[in-house]
Amino acid sequence: MKLIKHICLQLILCLLALIAQQSIFAQAYNAEAFLPPPSGPYKIGTKEIYLTDSSRHEKYSWSKKYRKMSVKIWYPSDYTPELGYDCYMATYSTKIIFDIFKPLGVKKSFLDSTRHFKTHSVCNAPLSTKQDKFPVIIFSSGYYFGIPDLNSCIMENLASNGYIVCSLTHPYEQPYVAFPDGKKIYLKKGRTRLAFLQLLIADWVRPKDKSTVEKREAITRNTLKRLKKFDKALKLWVDDSEFFVKTLIDNCAKNDTFFCKIDTSRIGALGHSFGGAVAGQLCKNDPRVKAGINIDCFQFGNVIDNPLTSPFMLIESSTYIDWNIGNEIIYSKSNADFYKLSILNSSHFIFSDASVIPFSNPKNVTDFNGKANGRKTINATNNFVLHFFDYYLNHDSKSKKLLEDKFSNSEMIFDYKLKQ
């Protein structure tokens, strides 16, 4: 009898141990990155820097203080895994993210759960010593919704392939930025929403007849004239970006231990949503920026009358058909190599981490990504972004060959027009 009790006790203990072990494995799995594994040979480090432009006063402040900004940087590293990976969205409270994305039906409890996931990056890991210099990409995310970490998929992939990627935060017109002195700047919701109101009015009064190129161009020009709020924001963000380019060059000249590793002869511009329009205008304004990519934004600004002279790529969703038509008019005037990747049946946020975030509600997947496959889309986006910059910044002949293959299928269309 005692033997039977002993055996039963051992079985119970084994069962409890197995359950505990499964629980530990589950917790470990939940802490793993949902972000796709970066494709490059480098490990990834992150750091944040804070800058003040003493040549410009802050337009959103009555106190005439100088314009301040923060920059999150992803970069190639040779760290060891023991350093521990960054948590996803670690510097943003759930409340801030929820307040911005609540209209899209995302639950606060779900946002809380994403914070247990890890990225593939390590905060303040040492910069890689495997190259003397690395090319740099200047990135901006979206107006109103823009959070640098929400584009970690693209940032990490570029950094793992030897790029230093600098994501600028534009205070007052993006959700949140905190400075080392304790100052916190939040989105000016009322003022920023006026830009969207102008957009709604422009859509409402837009002529419906788009039957000819001339009519489509007239519609595009009329839309650009009506979007004054976005034009003002574009100038502010481009000024931020040009100030950052100057900062990079100045710090390189001072032999800063981090910035002296940046090759300022190989600068690219990249942006998602409104940041994509910033990339286009920055390429036009600043000859130090050698190539750029607009991910899913209408090209605000004066590019329509001042065609691009730098290689450029447009990656577009199916969300804003009129924007796509307008971009076709604007970029058709380009005086440099131009590429376009169209993702069919997709929504605007499919180019962000929303493409792979493990949403618990299937409706969220459709709202953010459309009907397109999120993981396949972000992988394709990463592939084209990388090959584009590899060719135009690193002069890699293999990437050139990959960019020469036009294709069209039920999911994507890739086309280009090369300068003769």
Mark where each language-model region is:
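The feature captures the conserved acid-bearing segment of alpha/beta-hydrolase catalytic domains
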Residues: 290-351
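Alpha/beta-hydrolase active-site loop
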Residues: 179-261
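Alpha/beta-hydrolase-fold serine-hydrolase catalytic core, especially in secreted/extracellular enzymes
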Residues: 28-36, 41, 45-46, 54-55, ...
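Short substrate-entry loop that stabilizes the transition state in hydrolases
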Residues: 120-134, 139-178, 320-322
